[in-house]
From Swiss-Prot:
Belongs to the universal ribosomal protein uL29 family. GO terms for molecular function: structural constituent of ribosome. This is Large ribosomal subunit protein uL29. One of its GO terms (cellular component) is cytosolic large ribosomal subunit. Keywords: Ribonucleoprotein, Ribosomal protein.
Amino acid sequence: MNDLKLLRSKLSTDTIEELYKNLNLLKKELFNLRFQQALGELKNTSRFSLVKKSIARIKTELTKRSNSEEY
């Protein structure tokens, strides 16, 4: 739970460029996880949900920032 608070505070302090960079890295990791699963090499399937949730958190932060710039 404490890690989640640190992640949220880090997301709010990162620049937009850093957020997009992290988003691209997580998307690549998700692709690799899917590839490993298709080959039957994936051991830690819970990593899927963690990566997907991190992607959603970054997208949410980007949306918040874009909406705040409009007003």
